[in-house]
UniProtKB/Swiss-Prot annotation:
DNA-binding region in chain numbering: 28-60
Organism: Aspergillus flavipes
GO cellular component, one term: nucleus
Coiled-coil intervals, chain numbering: none
Protein name stated in the entry: Transcription factor ffsR
UniProt keyword terms in alphabetical order: DNA-binding, Nucleus, Transcription, Transcription regulation
Bilayer-crossing regions: none
Keyword Transport attributed: no
Ranges for region Disordered: 1-21, 73-130, 154-249, 451-470
Compositional bias of kind Polar residues: 1-12, 92-103, 154-169, 238-249
Amino acid sequence: MDTLTAPTTQSEQPPPPLTASLSRRYACDRCRSHKLRCNRDLMTSTNSPCQRCRKARVKCTIGASIRVGLSPEELKNGENVHRASPGRSAGSHRTASTPSNHAPRSHGRTFTPESAHQAPPYPSNRSMSGSMRLSPVPWLDMISFDGAQELNFDGSTSGLPMGSHTNGSGPLHAPMGGSTSSNTSSTFLDVRPPLHTPASSKPQQEAWRTGDDSTDLRLLSQIPRTRGGGVTDPAAGLTQQHPAGVTSSAPLVSHDHAFAPPQTSIISEPIPGDDLPAGGRPPTWFPARSRAGSTPSPTELKDACIQKLSDLSASLMKDLDLIITCKTASSFLFTPSDKTAAGYLFKTLDGSMTEDNAVARMLYGSERFLDIIKLFNQLPSLPSSSLSMPAAAAAAAAAASYGSTRPVDSDDAYYYSDLEDTGDIRSRNPTPEDRGNEQWSILQAYLGRAGQGPPMGPSQGSSSRSTTTNCSSSFVEVQKPDVPSILVILSCYTCLLKIYETVFFVIQHVLECSPANPSGTTDIPHTVRDLNINGFFLQNHRTLQIKILIQVSTYMLDSIQKSLGTILSDSMFQALLKTLMKEEGCTITSQGEETGMQGVRDLIRRVEEMLA
């Protein structure tokens, strides 16, 4: 007779034994990542790929699935094991047959930081009495040490006083040290991370992970501190005061946005030269001083002008070489019989329809030369000696008002005794100003004995001041252009004159080859293209374009001559200019200043007469 037995409940059924390969997922990795149903026949073979992977011609893999949760044995025994600890779960599966015998967990498996943060702060010491329990987390870089602490081999920390760190509430959250086994010589540490890691320790943990030693220094340098030793929170606007010798256990910076890079002085510093007057303000290409807010010195301004003149000279030389080459080629390749005026002017001026128009580059170069010369003339005077007139005059006036009757050849004892008899209270303790005045009077007396100037005495009165002013004025000379300035200005000046001469020579030759009435012909090419006056274009008025070019060129030449007034009068500039004109075969005026513009002005006048 068959007896009916009571059905066993699910909790009383023994758990099924697991194989060494652990449980396997039904869906493959590719279908799980795409969230698709895996059409895989497990009845045929466990190693056969699914239909989707076979169709995509990819390798079908199934990752191992580790059981998550507590085993019935652990629930029955009541052991405090966290449900998210894979190490403990795997250990419980391996010891399912003998749940009371717990072997030490192996650290060969892979652990994640998430599982470490979810671990309890203190391990259970059940069945672990008399021995040290190892931490399931095998890394040490999750500990957030303070900047002044060092981890010793005995588990203690050394460094600056930690204040409230001694009670275990500081940045060193894990219990260091614990207990030491009596039968072993090595020390084991429980370095379990805390349950809640502060947000401020994330950069420090990253620094420990990557080995970056400069992170702590950057964090400390970004904290604004007050005079009382407190740390100011830039986000909350609060100041925490700490007693002397005690380091706060609070996080250094409690907000992630507080780690923004500080503003540098390079962005906010003023542009050098902005404080110059409006009349003599240099352009943006002038050199800047290394110190922010300082005005460039006259020497730097002059060097910048010379550099710009050198660049302009190189550009003008290229333009001059181009126009001379075109003029020579046009003259030799074509004869006046088969050469039209339009073709001649077009080839000589290198294409008036392009940006390389010789007329446009001539006027543009003249404008740049005028701008640089105006700035060059506005440079302040440079003294030829380090002793300036105001300082010397002030020292001489102070020495004259001192009223000392000391002979130059007397000794100091006689001098001080004389001052004491006259009741001068400064004889006992002479000030540095008095000593400077005395040295200045000695210098003046030495110059008088040497025949370089009259000696200064107390009886000269007002004449001493005028003598001092005259002597001091010899230290400052009138500004004269130096040799580099003269050479670079002369180079630009001669190139411009040669370009003007070549352009108007070509225009004159074109007008000579034109019909008798040049005002009615249309064979003259454009010299001033796309010029209009409120919609009135000059396309059909070729001679009017030449007249406008004559007026503009005359104005530019007059402006250049006026700006070079002081430089043209220099003897060295005149000598070099006359030498160049002799080499070119130009006529030189015997009297007066030589400007070199006479040949260009004659050409302009002849062209203007032909258009009249």
